[in-house]
């Protein structure tokens, strides 16, 4: 029987679980699903059976790639969980999830502390102002240090941690947690699956530490919450209820981040973390109105309250292909109600869409529901044109919500189908995957006719090619990864003139343009392009100006040095001339394109390459080797740290020097070092290396 999703918004929590690759995020999610009564058998990631990791590759690799959305219930509250991937190649997935969440649980590894990926995700969450609580996981592991992790939350994440629990014991003696809000001990005996725990008095040998940390908790809150400040100054001891209310206010205002601890794998500390989700993270009501603008006019701002009575507004934040259902579109509903069969407007594209079925998702099972209201996250079947980041709304009350920004891909590979039969399957596969993942891009190389796919890193492309094989049965050969170089200019050139004329029998062609070209104001890799029209006195008729602009943009696709796209330039159209009969849009497009190329040649063009931010963790004895190797890859060392006896080296290294690094690093350190890497910026390629790249590109 289809159900109707709850309408008491105060009792809804939309949360994400975010973390570094091995901090134990999927295990934590699994435990949540188990204790909230959805899974009867706990799924273990290292057995490859976890519910949230439902794609075949995830189960093999033990990493979460797609954010599966799951609904569960805890103490009368409905919690919608979006599982987010922790690997840096999947930042787009994290970005997508954060855009539609109200709160998040950041999971940290008590041994490794705050790792680079955690920082990346934390910065993304800061950008979307998502309130968070922290769960310091793996307290049972050798080398676990709760307080060091809390210190790193301050130094690496610039956050204000609010310690609301202390660990009771550590490593193999980890028994449970000390609850500083209610001043009691929570003890897990280790029997069964951790479903039950005992609430006991705090042991005498831990009481002093608990009191000291509780005082710190109250002092920190007083600094960030007026009501707590008054109680503090008047010398009143706050009640548990007053403390919880103050923690909730300060957390939702993004002033503090409550810190809890436990061991998901050993089934300890997960239920109190669920209580904290309910107690401290916001409901859709706390987040308030969502703001969008009127289609076609961004200056007219529109507000929608999180209420079923408002006009319907939702954001499509994820698209997935399901073998049986076809295309599934995940929606976050901000206002109004959605019913199966409804006709909606895709305001981003200005097109009508019809909803087939509305589904509530569990990691890879689903149930049909009749309708869902504001604040809910659902999947729908039947949308044809909607892509990630589009707004769906009531056709009578159009609104466009802010979309998401996706980074441009930094790595390309050529892909060729093995047989003629694979050719058609390949284009279907590529189209489907590109619909799901905006950072996966495809184009055809004009010169070689090859299909080029581009993504955020080697792992990203490996997994996409793997999915083509598994889900679409495409056998394909994949070339070596290529770097996505860009070109730009370093100086301004003025008055570059080009006249395009062809006057041989029949209709002629004539167009003259004069342009200035100069570097834009953005960072080196910005795709920025600006076109300024300074034509006066009708020297070029108005209707031909866009053609000049289009010609310049077309010329930018193939730079003058090595045919890579040009970025970050400003074109100013200063002057020109036309012919009453022979001028046309095409003539001005050609003139614009040729003038741009000529100007670019004169404007000191340079080649840009993607620079990656690399962090290597290595035992002390290999440190010299690792640094020497990074230097030989044109790397610049930015910082060195020591964390729990492991040396951490941060460096900026060109992507072209990082191919195959994983094997080299293993060989150098006997497999004991690990690294992570993410895109940092574009920078100019040194002249000697640029010359080689240009020669190669020109086939010399």
UniProtKB/Swiss-Prot annotation:
Transmembrane segments: none
Domain tr-type G: 10-285
UniProtKB keywords: Cytoplasm, Elongation factor, GTP-binding, Nucleotide-binding, Protein biosynthesis
A single BP term in Gene Ontology: ribosome disassembly
GO molecular function: GTP binding; GTPase activity; translation elongation factor activity
Superkingdom, natural source: Bacteria
Predominant place of localization: cytoplasm
Keyword DNA damage: no
PANTHER family: RIBOSOME-RELEASING FACTOR 2, MITOCHONDRIAL, TRANSLATION ELONGATION FACTOR G-RELATED
Family: Belongs to the TRAFAC class translation factor GTPase superfamily. Classic translation factor GTPase family. EF-G/EF-2 subfamily.
Function: Catalyzes the GTP-dependent ribosomal translocation step during translation elongation. During this step, the ribosome changes from the pre-translocational (PRE) to the post-translocational (POST) state as the newly formed A-site-bound peptidyl-tRNA and P-site-bound deacylated tRNA move to the P and E sites, respectively. Catalyzes the coordinated movement of the two tRNA molecules, the mRNA and conformational changes in the ribosome.
Name recorded for this polypeptide: Elongation factor G
Organism per entry: Acidothermus cellulolyticus (strain ATCC 43068 / DSM 8971 / 11B)
Name of the gene: fusA
